[in-house]
From Swiss-Prot:
Belongs to the ATPase delta chain family. F-type ATPases have 2 components, F(1) - the catalytic core - and F(0) - the membrane proton channel. F(1) has five subunits: alpha(3), beta(3), gamma(1), delta(1), epsilon(1). F(0) has three main subunits: a(1), b(2) and c(10-14). The alpha and beta chains form an alternating ring which encloses part of the gamma chain. F(1) is attached to F(0) by a central stalk formed by the gamma and epsilon chains, while a peripheral stalk is formed by the delta and b chains. The keyword Membrane applies. It is found in: Cell inner membrane. Its main location: membrane. It is a peripheral membrane protein. Pfam families: OSCP. Disulfide bonds: none annotated. F(1)F(0) ATP synthase produces ATP from ADP in the presence of a proton or sodium gradient. F-type ATPases consist of two structural domains, F(1) containing the extramembraneous catalytic core and F(0) containing the membrane proton channel, linked together by a central stalk and a peripheral stalk. During catalysis, ATP synthesis in the catalytic domain of F(1) is coupled via a rotary mechanism of the central stalk subunits to proton translocation. HAMAP family: ATP_synth_delta_bact. This is ATP synthase subunit delta. Keywords: ATP synthesis, Cell inner membrane, Cell membrane, CF(1), Hydrogen ion transport, Ion transport, Membrane, Transport. The lineage of its organism: Bacteria, Pseudomonadati, Pseudomonadota, Alphaproteobacteria, Hyphomicrobiales.
């Protein structure tokens, strides 16, 4: 499988990578990749929003039975079924819930790779208009020669401009960096 930038190499190692790879292969064989992605995304969103669920996932204090029972309740309430639900149950039964966020990230990497999508981290000083966002996507699509998924973040400390990370390449065209360069050049000129 092709690796897009440094993301796959670091994300697909260890336990998380093995679990994610097994899930991806099964989902692909059953033509359920998108359904599994949706279920995992829903669980991941719940995990980010709930301090109690985070405690359940991270704490070794809870027994396997308690974790499985709590996960069952969350899955039922969230309407997560099929392979995604079975995968989350398996992680709970094997005392691997603490690795689940990494497993979900690794699964997403595999899905993007299979679909020929690369991920780009984009930081801007202020939220972009839809037109600017489309322009950024089109430019990155041309550079990557692939479909691009944006991870957009607003960072007022940039003052202005943009910082883009695409795979192992990074372009910093922020006003903050330009001002720092000018400051260093002036200091060195003394």
């Amino acid at each position: 499988m092709a690796q897009n930038g440094s993301e796959s190499g670091s994300t697909l190692g260890g336990v998380a990578g093995r679990y994610a790879s097994a899930l991806f292969e099964l989902a692909r064989d059953e033509r359920a990749v998108d359904a599994v992605t949706e279920g995992l995304d829903r669980f991941d969103a719940l995990l980010r929003e709930s301090a109690d669920l985070q405690r359940l996932v991270r704490s070794p204090v809870f027994s396997t039975e308690e974790q499985v029972k709590a996960v069952e309740a969350v899955l039922a309430r969230a309407g997560i079924t099929g392979l995604a639900a079975n995968f989350i149950r398996l992680a709970a039964a094997n005392r691997r819930l603490f690795v689940l966020p990494d497993m979900i990230r690794a699964y997403r990497v595999l899905v993007r790779e299979a679909k020929g999508i690369v991920r780009a981290e984009v930081r801007l000083a202020e939220p972009p208009s839809d037109a600017v966002l489309e322009e950024i996507k089109a430019s990155l699509r041309d550079v990557a020669r692939a479909e691009v998924e944006l991870d957009l973040r607003v960072d007022p400390s940039l003052i202005g401009g943009i910082v883009v990370k695409l795979g192992s390449r990074m372009v910093d065209a922020s006003l903050r960096t330009r001002l720092n360069s000018i400051r260093l050049a002036m200091r060195d000129a003394r």
